[in-house]
Amino acid sequence: MKIVSTLLGELEFEEEDIIMFPAGIPAFEQEKSFLLIAMGEGVPFYYLQSALNPELCLVVANPFAFFPRYSIEIGQEELQRLDCSQREELLLYVILTVPQDFRESTANLVAPLIINQESKKGLQFIATNSDYTTRHPIFQPTQAEEQTGIAAAEEG
């Protein structure tokens, strides 16, 4: 199979690479099939590219790379929807908002994506009673930046 992504160019994939989101993703409910593509080896960032819509590509990340204590409580209903028999089958990602200055990127910690890597089913879980935000900065300012309000100049 093949799709020409607006962001990523031509992508070839097999049907077993497709992750199905039976309920879609809020704001993209009509989109049900996606590809999870690593941005590079050893980095926590991924593309979540629609398998049908070349213009729909989200940037997602492993939340634990930025928020080691991040946790959500997944109920039995969600586990059943994912055809999950063991929690070890699950992968967790958060959708990022990436502005022009990548250092200002934020993560939606309220509504992570949960993917069963065995069944290839996914859903967006909406956490209730959470202290998390939908725009949590993933890069923390350095102590000097916090004290002065001035970011360090980029080298190069």
Curated annotation (Swiss-Prot):
This protein's record includes keyword Chaperone: yes
Report which superkingdom the organism of origin falls in.
Answer: Bacteria
Q: Main location per UniProt?
A: cytoplasm
Q: Which keywords does this Swiss-Prot/TrEMBL entry list? A: Bacterial flagellum biogenesis, Chaperone, Cytoplasm, Translation regulation
Q: List the disulfide bonds in this chain.
A: none
Q: Where in the cell is it found?
A: Cytoplasm
GO CC, one annotated term:
cytoplasm
First and last residue of the signal peptide: none
Single Gene Ontology BP term?
A: regulation of translation
Entries under Pfam families matching the protein? FliW
- Subunit info? Interacts with translational regulator CsrA and flagellin(s).
- Protein role: Acts as an anti-CsrA protein, binds CsrA and prevents it from repressing translation of its target genes, one of which is flagellin. Binds to flagellin and participates in the assembly of the flagellum.
Instruction: Return the similarity comment.
Output: Belongs to the FliW family.
Cited NCBIfam families: PRK13285.1-1
Protein name as catalogued:
Flagellar assembly factor FliW
Q: What gene makes this protein?
A: fliW
